[in-house]
Amino acid sequence: DLVIVESPAKARTVGRFLGKAYDVKASMGHVRDLPRRSLGVEIEEQSFVPTYTVSSDKRKIVSELKKAAASAGTVYLATDPDREGEAISWHLMEAASIDLDKAKRVVFHEITETAIEEAFSNPRGLDTDLVNAQQARRVLDRLVGYKLSPVLWSKIKKGTSAGRVQSVAVRMVVDREKEIQDFVPKEYWTIRATFVPGGSATFQASLSSIDGSKGRPEIPDNKSAEHILADLKGTSYAVSGYETKETKRRPSPPFITSTLQQEASRRLRFSASRTMTLAQQLYEGIEISGSEQVGLITYMRTDST
């Protein structure tokens, strides 16, 4: 039986669990895409049907997979469990002419022996909804980039690009920057005091009310603050009451794609691309202290499943 995954690292990890009865090969990612030098999408009649081509660097891989699939009893498509992975499996079936009757889709969210055994015990067919979702995203990416980028070349400079997500994100950044520039700072003051009760530990308190008024008092400038301080000095204070309560702090939930990138940026100063590259390696499997290759995390692209 033939098993197709995306990368050699993933192939090694999966192959270790499956054993020699399975021939595990890597497609090296997508094997087909829209043509580089033309739109590749039918827009004249507004059908928006894409035309795909096998990239020159993938022709040898497709040829080898086609030959292996023809001689295999069953072809297991074990690409990633999201719309990109589903689309890769669909493109493989089309490009390598894999017989629909012998093709089976297996999905796992972690590369462990238990997860792989479960996936291969419960294969399914291709999810056409996920495939169509990926195609819609790819077509939109091409239409926006292909049509708008030349406008930017003429208006701004050559090489400037537009994108379905990129352009919206840039607009949000620009709008936020305008808000920052238009912000008029307003001076305000707060008053805090450190109390030293006789024989007790010190504690701090903030001025939250004057003469029983509701709401924190507004102190617009230093003069107002000094006036309030003059009234407060020499006054006797008493603790009118206190409250103790037990609080529970829940552990943080497991990372999703966005929170993983945010924490890696905050703690380690990693870029989003570096974070995802490292996460991909941890998912597909790495060698630890000379041991066999093992996958260490679940699938990291939670926003596209």
How would you name each of these model-derived features?
Residues 1-135, 147, 216-220:
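Intrinsically disordered, low-complexity regulatory segments
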Residues 4, 55, 78, 82, ...:
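Hydrophobic alpha-helical scaffolding
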Residues 12-16, 60-70, 90-94, 114-121, ...:
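Solvent-exposed alpha-helical segments within well-ordered globular domains of core cellular machineries
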Residues 23, 32-54, 162-284:
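Long, highly charged, low-complexity internal segments
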Residues 70-71, 111-198, 241-248:
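C-terminal or mid-to-C-terminal helical accessory/interaction module adjacent to the motor/catalytic core
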Residues 72-76, 154-156, 240-247, 258-267, ...:
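Glycine- and acidic
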Residues 86-87, 110, 134, 138, ...:
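An alpha-helix initiation/capping motif
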Residues 270-305:
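Extended, well-ordered alpha-helical scaffold/bundle regions in very large, multi-domain proteins
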